[in-house]
Regions:
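Gly/Ala-rich phosphate-binding loop of Rossmann-like dinucleotide-binding domains
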Residues: 80, 84, 124, 269
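Phosphate/Mg2+-binding loops and adjacent switch elements
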Residues: 96-215
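A residue-level signal for conserved active-site and pocket-lining positions in enzyme catalytic cores
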Residues: 33, 73, 123, 157, ...
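Residue-level preference for the first positions of well-ordered beta-strands
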Residues: 59, 91, 130, 152-155, ...
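A transmembrane-helix-recognition feature enriched in membrane-embedded lipid enzymes
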Residues: 2-58
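ATP-dependent carboxylate-amine ligase
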Residues: 1-12, 85-88, 160-352
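Walker A (P-loop) phosphate-binding motif
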Residues: 42-109, 349
Length: 352
């Protein structure tokens, strides 16, 4: 195991427990320094010394209070689809974590994950919405509006702790791990403290069967849509439940390059599959195949699939067969209705 992976595993053992352990308490002085640094970062905006940039249209920020994944990207995709179904014309901005370079760039069907980031590419592929990536979110919002004047709401992929771009609404996502031991980084997983009540204009979504902290919120509807061969997925084919069910009773390798891969593995086991789990680092690049040479069938998340070319699975009889597993992640109707109601109160025109 690499040194970084060992450190990550050790921190996870400290973070994801109901109460702080002795090891977490020993790290807590560093958490106090982190809290001071975060407060100093926010101070110029709170005192009016620095003004947050306001986009021409409403901005909805989607993010986590905890380090690592809690289901932010599926939430962004589901939110964009819900806005589209309601007649809105959303666009998406993202930093494009893990990509090469930091320049402003539009995501299009010919983009690669290396150039724009795996999550922005997946969001664009799943929703068809215009997506721009850039280190400075304000500049990305202006570039998006300039290129797509029809956009009437911007969804910011991540950025809860970034204050240079003003937000009108925010969606905070928690998974079944909640706030862990309740401490700030590095003693715990929190990027900012969990207050007694959620901030104003905050909608809370639980990527879990029930609420996992004290904030009121909605629970997402989640499941597996099925599986499709990688080459067919790139061709636009949808995931089939039958293809996934056909893998039952066969030895299958399940690979997942995400912050919480066990969630994917658990869903596959719940679907009746016998899997050999292969957890990978978040944003894993797939420069070389990580699965065993003897593997016959490999299941991948869509986030990982965007980093593999179609010809990685070009031969119908190739070994291993690469399957993309689609996630069915939906927002509750009352959650969408409440968010749309708040969005209607924000009086700003389209980008044009």
């Amino acid at each position: 195991m690499r040194a970084a992976a060992r450190i990550e595993a050790a921190l996870a053992r400290l973070w994801w427990r109901p109460q702080p352990s002795l090891g977490a308490r020993l790290l807590q002085p560093l958490s106090w320094l982190y809290r001071i640094g975060a407060a100093l970062h926010r101070l110029p905006y709170r005192l009016g010394w620095r003004a947050a940039q306001r986009a021409p249209v409403p901005v909805i920020v989607v993010g986590n209070l905890v380090a690592g994944g809690a289901g932010k990207t599926p939430t962004v995709i589901a939110l964009v689809q819900a806005l589209q179904a309601a007649g809105r014309r959303p666009g998406v901005i993202s930093r494009g974590y893990g990509r090469q370079g930091s320049e402003l760039r539009a995501v299009d069907p010919a983009s690669t994950a290396a150039a724009v980031g795996d999550e922005p590419l997946l969001i664009h592929r799943r929703t068809g919405a215009p997506v721009w990536v850039g280190r400075r979110r304000g500049a990305a919002a202006l570039a998006l509006c300039g290129a797509h004047p029809e956009v009437d709401v911007i969804v910011a992929d991540d950025g809860l702790q970034h204050h240079a771009l003003a937000r009108d609404l925010q969606v905070v996502v928690f998974d079944d791990r909640g706030a862990g031991n309740g401490l700030l980084l590095p003693a715990g997983p929190l990027r900012q403290p969990v207050t007694r009540h959620p901030p104003v204009n905050t909608h809370v979504l639980y990527n879990a069967p029930a609420a996992t902290i004290g904030w009121p919120g909605a629970t997402a509807v989640r499941g597996l849509r099925g599986a499709v061969r990688l080459r067919d997925w790139w061709g636009g084919a949808g995931a089939s439940p039958g293809a996934l069910h056909a893998l039952r009773g066969r030895p299958v390798t399940a690979a997942a390059g995400m912050a919480a891969p066990q969630r994917f593995f658990t869903m596959l086991r719940s679907a009746g599959l016998t899997i050999e789990p292969l957890p990978l680092p978040d944003h894993y690049g797939f420069a070389t195949p990580p699965w065993p040479a003897a593997a016959r069938d490999v299941l991948l998340t869509e986030k990982d699939a965007v980093k593999l070319p179609p010809d990685a699975d070009a031969d119908a009889d190739a070994r291993p067969r690469l399957w993309v597993v689609g996630l069915d992640f939906r927002l509750p109707d009352d959650f969408v209705a409440a968010l749309l109601d708040n969005l209607r109160r924000v009086q700003r025109p389209q980008c044009r």
